Design a protein with these regions (language model features):
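Ligand-binding pockets and gating/stacking loops
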Residues: 1-430
Length: 430
């Protein structure tokens, strides 16, 4: 653990914000496959290898709760390293919230979202399957935003209606750009106190907002009265997304289109400094989907997903979840490998969005933030809880030179000790 963090916290440059985000992906990566490093299912993370510390052999066995499997206890233990405190409560705080409380005990600046929680997922029988930010007392740190338009409104587009205390809300203006036109003109005009580089950056930020408004709300420039209300999400939500645990049919294109918009909007919120803490989920713990579609990576076809056909089953038995139940070190595990590889591609999609902009210290938001990637288990067979909760995959970013990236480390330690090392390096403790 001593090798994870640089010895002197003073190595971190102080002129960028402290940020902490948790990135969760469902079902996990079996520990034996993690040993293959970037030559296996972790390949999509390879272009970012210099900015990541991959941690193998992280032990989350203390999170075991009798009578339930890792889809519940391991999922709630991700980023908390504690057994679940109930069906809708963690056994302690998540690491992002420990860091938030340490650096902002009185709250963040007005106008900022204290904690942003979003994701693309379908299983929802317990909150811990999909929500991964918890307060110091283990309660959820915010409301999950599972639709792109809801996440956009959470960050940019809703204000309280009056001061009469009722719960009604109204939209500030459907277009964020309409609400900042005067400021934009001033800060990019002749009397602006900004330099040319800063003016350019302001313009680029607003152009990026316009791009996401168009995508999230189907805005049409010809509509003089503003954009249309956003359409319903093209994927299922609520009870329809988890019909009795039987799973849903979905194409790879439908899944990734929804996720990319969600990931883009979340990254935009961070880039605009509206959000510094929170979590994002790509597929819930124990996710049940029947995925169909050609999967390509780096210009080559990796696999053709067709879960129900390849499993020769329908309902829950025809879902990709079953490949984790069927995992064996003695088999090729072709289908599981393809699914896990795809999940790493989509995690990398989000990370790359945060690696595009440089901050004042010359590093990207990705490099300056503490972004922790994890999942619920290191084995999906459910017949050995110790094996199931051992070897849980973790990766972290450098957090502004606080952690040593560019390595794959066999940690061989409890998740609780790993997390305490991390938050300690961030100037926090719990």
């Amino acid at each position: 653990l001593d090798e994870m963090a640089f010895s002197a916290a003073s190595t971190a440059v102080k002129d960028v914000p402290v940020r902490a985000f948790n990135v969760f992906f469902g079902l996990g990566i079996p520990a034996p496959l993690q040993k293959e490093g970037y030559e296996g299912v972790l390949e999509p993370l390879k272009p970012l290898r210099d900015k990541l510390l991959i941690m193998r052999n992280v032990d989350q066995v203390r999170c075991d709760v009798s009578g339930i499997n890792a889809h519940f206890d391991g999922a709630t233990g991700s980023f908390t390293a504690m057994p679940a405190g109930g069906e809708a409560k963690a056994g302690g705080p998540s690491i992002d919230q420990v860091v938030r409380q340490a650096h902002h005990p009185g709250g963040l600046s007005p106008g900022m979202v204290p904690t942003l929680i979003g994701g693309t997922y379908f299983r929802r029988s317990r909150v811990g399957r999909y929500l991964h930010s918890y307060n110091l007392d283990g309660t959820v740190a915010g409301t999950m935003q599972e639709k792109p338009r809801d996440l956009f409104d959470r960050v940019f587009g809703v204000v309280n209606a009056g001061t009469d205390g009722d719960a009604r809300k109204q939209r500030l203006k459907r277009s964020v750009l309409d609400s900042v036109v005067d400021q934009y003109k001033f800060y990019t005009g002749a009397n602006s106190p900004l330099g040319s580089a800063s003016k350019t950056r302001v313009a680029e930020h607003l152009e990026r907002i316009r791009e996401y408004e168009l995508r999230a709300f189907e805005m049409k420039h010809r509509n003089s009265e503003g954009p249309k209300l956003p359409p319903r999400s093209k994927v299922l939500h609520g009870g329809q997304a988890d019909p009795g645990g039987q799973g849903i049919d979905i194409t790879l294109e439908e899944l990734t289109t929804e996720w990319h918009l969600m990931a883009d909007l979340y990254a935009l919120s961070v880039q605009m400094d509206r959000v510094r803490f929170g979590s994002i989920t790509f597929l819930a713990a124990g996710e049940r989907i029947r995925l169909v579609g050609d999967y390509e990576y780096d210009g080559r076809k990796i696999f053709e997903f067709n879960d129900p056909k390849q499993l020769n089953a329908s309902g829950d038995q025809g879902c990709s979840h079953e490949w984790w139940h069927k995992f064996s070190e003695k088999k090729k595990n072709e289908q599981l490998r393809a699914h896990a590889h795809m999940k790493m591609r989509e995690v990398a999609y989000f990370l790359n969005r945060l690696d595009s902009d440089k901050e004042a210290n010359g590093k990207s938001i990705l490099e300056n933030s503490m972004i922790t990637i994890s999942t619920e288990s290191g084995d999906g067979r459910h017949n050995d809880s110790k094996r199931e909760l051992s070897g849980v995959f973790h990766a972290i970013t450098g957090a502004n030179s606080r952690f040593k990236t560019g390595e794959i480390m066999d940690v061989g330690a409890e998740g609780l000790d790993v997390y305490n090392t991390m938050v300690g390096a961030m100037g926090a403790k719990h």
